[in-house]
Curated annotation (Swiss-Prot):
The gene is clpX. GO terms for molecular function: ATP binding; ATP hydrolysis activity; ATP-dependent protein folding chaperone; protein dimerization activity; unfolded protein binding; zinc ion binding. ATP-dependent specificity component of the Clp protease. It directs the protease to specific substrates. Can perform chaperone functions in the absence of ClpP. This is ATP-dependent Clp protease ATP-binding subunit ClpX. It comes from the Bacteria. It comes from Arthrobacter sp. (strain FB24). Zn(2+) binds at residues 13, 16, 35, 38. GO terms for cellular component: HslUV protease complex. Residues 1-54 form the ClpX-type ZB domain.
Length: 429
């Protein structure tokens, strides 16, 4: 290998030409040298190539039953929604693995792969607040190990107006994939509060609806599949900035909303809508059950435009959580609220216990508030706040017991000291 210098005879890297003094390490081979910087660069090139090969087509796609069983471990109730989502997600990723996903624009050009082209099936999730819509989507993404992003439709406006462009939704997905665009192109985007961008009136208006119908129009292309230009730093586009190009053809969109008032539209269509004393009693008790009978024309009347509805072929619903379901949510799932707080108390070396009656009262209070499962955490925080404030300053407490009176009457919880526990153990021994 070439040597330079008159007195020191410095060796050079055969690839980049840097001398041994310019690098940290120079490794010798038969007649060649390579520096640590070139080795690191080679590793990066190999990792990029391996990442391209190890795309979604190489991972084992769980069957609908397996996806459903996984959802069962974390989500209480909502059986129809879990089944629909399991099938829809399985079909979506099976379509990608089979290589039937067309490139953007091929639908318009009439290009077919193997004579049969499988279209993408985005999902519309309808149901009251606090019933697990977002949690269902998050759990799905965790099972599939794909990038997942949550967006709020209320922040979106049509391009050129104050607010977020729809492309910012795609930026969140790219960020969730650590800026790996290939990985992001097979991720899941969950858009919440989609009912808030409904048309302000059923009939088209001469005034521009930039946060309603305008947003629906702007979402059409990315829902269907297009190559979108995304500003890497978010915000508005301007002509002199660079963009990230992302193909949304294989991105699964799950859009969700409470659609308050939709049950009245469904009732009017089906002829079950009564007035005053004529209203059927079972309808008064649980209007959300009628969500299961939703038809595209009901969504059109609610304020979604036909083109938007057409890009959401899978429509599934969730229903209000009843008392037994709320009690189960507190204690049964893997990430049950009681288990979460017990783990938090364990970090301070304290055992947290709940009476069954205490869980009943918490569920009853959540029902009264009408906020579904979200109300459970708020109530738990209110109940445990005084204990969580004092407990870290005390090292004599072994366990804390929450009873029904603690929840209902704000009574102090039962605190059992370490010496009491030790005495009980000695007696039992």
């Amino acid at each position: 290998m070439a040597r330079i210098g008159e007195s020191t005879d410095l060796l050079k890297c055969s690839f980049c030409g840097k001398s041994q003094k310019q690098v940290r390490k120079l490794i010798a081979g038969p007649g060649v040298y390579i520096c640590d910087e070139c080795i690191e660069l080679c590793n990066e090139i190999i990792e990029e190539e391996l990442a391209e090969v190890a795309d979604l087509g190489s991972f084992e796609l769980p069957k609908p039953r397996e996806i459903y069983d996984f959802l069962q471990e974390y989500v209480i109730g909502q059986e129809p929604a879990k089944r629909s989502l399991a099938v829809a997600v399985y079909n979506h990723y099976k379509r990608i693995q089979a290589g039937h996903a067309p490139k953007s624009g091929s639908l318009a050009e009439g290009v077919h792969h193997d004579d049969v082209e499988i279209a993408k099936s985005n999902i519309l999730l309808i149901g009251p607040t606090g019933c697990g819509k977002t949690y269902l989507a998050q759990t799905l993404a965790r099972r599939l190990n794909v990038p997942f992003a949550v967006a709020d439709a209320t922040a979106l406006t049509e391009a050129g107006y104050v607010g977020e462009d729809v492309e910012n939704i795609l930026l969140k997905l790219i960020q969730a994939a650590d800026y790996d665009v290939k990985k992001a192109e097979q991720g899941i985007i969950y858009i919440d509060e989609i009912d808030k961008i409904s048309r302000k009136s059923e009939n088209p208006s001469i005034t521009r609806d930039v946060s309603g119908e305008g947003v629906q129009q702007a979402l059409l292309k990315i829902l269907e599949g297009t190559v979108a230009s995304v500003p890497p730093q978010g915000g508005r586009k301007h002509p002199h900035q660079e963009f990230i190009q992302i193909d949304t053809t294989n991105v699964l969109f799950i859009v969700a909303g409470a659609f308050a008032g939709l049950e009245d539209i469904i009732g009017s269509r089906s002829g079950r809508k009564g007035i005053g004393f004529g209203a059927p009693l079972n309808e008064v008790k649980n209007n959300s059950d009628s969500y299961g009978e939703v038809m595209p024309e009901d969504l059109l009347k609610f304020g979604l435009i036909p083109e938007f509805i057409g890009r959401l072929p899978v429509i599934t619903t969730v229903s209000n959580l009843d008392r037994p379901a709320l009690i189960q949510i507190l204690s049964t799932p893997k990430n049950a609220l009681v288990k979460q707080y017990q783990k938090m108390f364990q970090l301070d070396g304290v055992e947290l216990l709940f009476d069954d009656e205490a869980l009943d009262v918490i569920a009853d209070q959540a029902l009264e508030r009408g906020t579904g499962a979200r109300g459970l955490r708020a109530i738990m925080e209110e109940v445990l706040l005084p204990v969580m404030f004092d407990l870290p300053s005390r090292d004599d407490i072994a366990s804390v017991v929450i009873t029904a009176d603690v929840v209902a009457k704000k009574a102090p919880p039962t605190m059992i000291a370490h010496d009491v526990v030790a005495k009980r153990r000695n007696k039992s021994a």
